[in-house]
Regions:
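Alpha-helical transmembrane segments in multi-pass integral membrane proteins
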Residues: 2-15, 21-48, 64-77, 133-145, ...
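Membrane-interface helix-loop-helix regions
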Residues: 88-161, 191-206, 212, 279-293
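Central hydrophobic cores of alpha-helical transmembrane segments in multi-pass inner-membrane proteins
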Residues: 56-66
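Membrane-interfacial loop-to-helix junctions in multi-pass inner-membrane proteins
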Residues: 9, 73-89, 110-118, 165
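His/acidic/aromatic-lined binding-pocket segments of jelly-roll/cupin-type domains
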Residues: 53-56, 223-224
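Alpha-helical transmembrane spans of integral membrane proteins, capturing the lipid-embedded, hydrophobic core
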Residues: 83, 87-95, 161, 187, ...
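Conserved beta-strand->loop/alpha-helix structural units within folded catalytic cores of enzymes
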Residues: 20-26, 59, 83, 87-92, ...
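Alpha-helical transmembrane segments and their helix-entry boundary regions
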Residues: 15, 78-79, 87, 156, ...
Length: 379
């Protein structure tokens, strides 16, 4: 979800690779949602939603690294235009696929209520412009309180824009000490939200809806993750690197394990899940980013894995969910078990990865290149 790094600076290939690993886990996590009734009984990549917090930390780090020393001669308008060019083409693709999937489902809410096509189209338009659907409004076309019911995961792009705006207007102006204080305060907020059981499940699966405390939890997590990423970018050349042999594979394995961990409720103590998620977000994820930024690819296999997974990470995240809406409808209509549905689920993972690659090569990359040239010529 980040701008390409300046050619004059080294590229963090391992960070790109880890973003792709996390994106694939998000797809698997969303597949598992079709077979659970709550966050506590989801058994397939139970903590996959924490990948969004990992993405936010990555975004903060790469944006800080890319732009902290480049504001001389660059305006906020230029920065925000670059962010829009980076993010909006795949938002548009996700909206088109989401609207198409909704029509394929018969234009009905999950409870079976028919929705007029005009509201489906309006929901798509509002999603494109990152205007959330209020709970109970006609734009909330699925009846599931999603912020963006055309394509649910696009809620994180809403917070990505907020984080970019906060960086552009305020955070970049903070001293390193003030930024460290902001990060620490936000970390306490993250821990308080998770361990204090704000959601009812002692978890950080927040931000996807405007219902109750969910958007506030998303804002707190975004504030910490972006601030932590910005802070690490400032400190990276001042503090020791953590060079680990085979860093990409070790970090990828840790991410898979952390995001696949079952709901932590040992001895009937669900607050342990809040502690677990706080540790992951506040301590382990920043450490993994630091290790990845410290390392380099040293062989062709690792280089290919990082380049490919990094390339498809954002397109995959942005466009995979519409097909999962159809998957859910099929599973629930036929009362299928995972044992019966897994071949289709596996095909969806492979198909969405292929779709992400095709969209990147023949739509996203060419369009962004054209928009960037047009933006420069229009200055």
């Amino acid at each position: 979800m980040n701008d390409p790094l300046p050619h004059s600076k080294p590229h963090y290939h391992l960070i790109d690779g880890l973003r792709g690993v996390a994106a694939i886990i998000v797809v698997i996590y969303h597949l598992g949602e079709g077979f659970c009734t709550s966050p506590a009984d989801l058994w397939l990549a139970n903590h996959g939603y924490l990948a969004v917090q990992f993405f936010f930390i990555l975004s903060g780090f790469v944006l800080g690294y890319s732009y902290d020393d480049r504001w001389t001669g660059m305006t906020s308008r230029v920065f925000l235009r670059r962010r829009i060019i980076r993010l909006q083409p795949m938002v548009a693709a996700g909206v088109v696929l989401g609207v198409a999937a909704y029509f394929m489902q018969g234009s009905v809410t999950w409870s079976g209520e028919h929705i007029s096509p005009i509201w489906v189209v309006l929901a798509g338009i509002s999603t494109f412009f990152m205007i959330p659907a209020w709970v109970g409004s006609p734009l909330e076309i699925r009846g599931n309180a999603e912020m963006f019911p055309v394509n649910g995961p696009l809620w994180s792009l809403f917070f990505e824009y907020l984080g970019s705006l906060a960086y552009c207007l305020a955070i970049r102006r903070l001293s390193t000490r003030a930024l460290a204080c902001l990060t620490a305060v936000a970390a306490v907020g993250v821990g308080g939200f998770a361990i204090g059981n704000a959601t009812g499940y002692y978890h950080l699966g927040v931000g996807w809806s405007l219902s109750g405390v969910i958007p506030w939890g998303g804002a707190i997590c975004m504030l910490f993750c972006f601030s932590a990423g910005f802070l690490m970018a400032r400190l990276f050349n001042r503090l020791p690197r953590l060079e680990v042999r085979g860093a990409f594979w070790w970090c990828a394995a840790v991410i898979v394990i952390l995001l696949s961990m079952p709901y932590v409720d040992y001895g009937g103590c669900p607050w342990l899940n809040g502690i677990y998620e706080t540790i992951c977000v506040v301590f382990v994820f920043p450490l993994l980013v630091w290790i990845a930024a410290s390392g380099k690819t040293t062989d062709s296999v690792t280089t290919f894995a990082c380049n490919f997974s990094g390339d498809i990470s954002y397109p995959l995240y942005a466009v995979h969910y519409p097909s999962l809406y159809l998957f859910y409808a099929w599973v629930w209509a036929n009362n299928l078990t995972w044992g019966e549905a897994w071949p289709v689920a596996a095909a969806l993972v492979a198909g969405n990865i292929l779709l992400a690659w095709l969209l990147l090569k023949f739509y996203d990359a060419p369009l962004r290149k054209w928009l960037s040239r047009k933006g420069k010529s229009g200055r």
